[in-house]
């Protein structure tokens, strides 16, 4: 209690000092600065009464605190929402470290009996969800010892501000075993940090203690088995230079018109769009010479012999198919009678990518060579050609609306039946209950910093509310490096399918898809089944990443920002089926299962005459 009074006095003196300094400033009539009601009050009165407060909720899910309750000063009515504000103060060694705004709510919206609160204090209620992993500019709470206090500020009808600081009070009944502990992580391309966060009740000060201890801080690249880093960096640079030199030499050789290359740094086998284009090419019974250069990750090393082979076949192939970001090819000048074709792995156009992100956090340099040498890009509809042209920095004439080959799968009834039967045989539990598939995109600026903050999911509540009717599958983006860490007591409900390669197969056995900003919504829409957009950070995502369309009008399903909202939508089946049909017809020109045919017809066997080059070998 003594510490609360000290904190209050410091805040009060600071605000009085600021007020005196401000009153010495002559405000010119032409000065059109706008202040909040709390910043332009005539004077501040230090309250002499102990405020009334009660905590109705103090629960933790990972590093996320949900706090609610009420607080008011006797004799100071709170009838108007815009005349009161409350904050949770974090105090380190007696000094205010930071303050988190609390959302003001009417007291009758709280989950406890508030009949003893006089009607004059209608806006005494508050609630907030605070993520301590993202507290400081998207970084965790720094290492240190903190105490929590509540602050209330209220402006009366005479434009006088009243302010009070008080302890949170005894919330030990909300803490199992009188203590709570969790871990926090921070991911970026150059830094990985891990913390322990310990929460307990301070009997002396009658408030909450937070103890944050840093466990680890390391450069993620050091976690890779890479001895002799400087030497390896030199060797990689040398190998890359040799690759470029070899490519230029091999360009002097004739193009082999029946040679087709498939290259990817995100798959080890011929799956996805590659699979459907490859199978269509086999149907044509032509004498194709196929070459495959496949790696599971952009981090996988390529040996010098591999690079020489790639240089030769890239230089002498008629067509090179890629399906993702493929950096080694971007500095190359593609030959006049050859094609570099991007069979982009994502369908539709949703969140901005590539050069559409110039100027945004993690966006590319305008002078980058990435993507610009594509001679062809395939997309799902005419409506999105302009977005892919902008994102890849290519002419719109190079973007062709053939449809996306892997979506042919959804129109092949025999193949769908076979896949479903195979899945039910391999995973019998998929048949017993309805299936929820959780498939969000990653957070971070790219592969090196990719992660997902699983603490935003309330595992316990999802389990208790949905386990009788559903099972919950995780299909996390392959870039994500942190794990869901499913608690063992929920292992009959949560299942991790992140290593399952083809998400389109899982969509067949899915009853409800939960995603956020992932392009999986386009393919799932072809099945006309319900989806939920769990976008807890949509405001931040719009600011940092942005979209090609207004997100709230775009999504063909309800928006949920919390686990509670997600559960409510599922249990009450509040889905937006009526929006799915128009969504599908905007992002897909052809719903016939013949996208692979069109890709082969328009790229491998184009109808128009091409200029003849005497360096092109005949089959």
Swiss-Prot record:
Q: Which GO terms describe its biological process?
A: cell wall organization; teichoic acid biosynthetic process
Q: Which InterPro entries match?
A: Glycerophosphate_synth (IPR007554), TagF_C (IPR043148), TagF_N (IPR043149), Teichoic_Acid_Biosynth (IPR051612)
Q: Does the keyword ATP-binding apply?
A: no
**Entry's family note:** Belongs to the CDP-glycerol glycerophosphotransferase family.
Reported EC number(s) for this entry are: 2.7.8.47
Question: Carries keyword Transferase?
Answer: yes
Name of the protein in its database record: Teichoic acid poly(ribitol-phosphate) polymerase
Q: Which GO terms describe its molecular function?
A: CDP-glycerol glycerophosphotransferase activity
- Keywords recorded for this protein, A-Z: Cell membrane, Cell wall biogenesis/degradation, Membrane, Teichoic acid biosynthesis, Transferase
| Catalytic activity, as annotated | 4-O-[1-D-ribitylphospho-(2R)-1-glycerylphospho]-N-acetyl-beta-D-mannosaminyl-(1->4)-N-acetyl-alpha-D-glucosaminyl di-trans,octa-cis-undecaprenyl diphosphate + n CDP-L-ribitol = 4-O-[(D-ribitylphospho)(n)-D-ribitylphospho-(2R)-glycerylphospho]-N-acetyl-beta-D-mannosaminyl-(1->4)-N-acetyl-alpha-D-glucosaminyl di-trans,octa-cis-undecaprenyl diphosphate + n CMP + n H(+)
Q: Name one Pfam family in it.
A: Glyphos_transf
Annotated pathway, please? Cell wall biogenesis; poly(ribitol phosphate) teichoic acid biosynthesis
Q: Where in the cell is it found?
A: Cell membrane
Task: List, alphabetically, the GO terms of the cellular component aspect.
Answer: plasma membrane
Q: How does it sit in the membrane?
A: Peripheral membrane protein
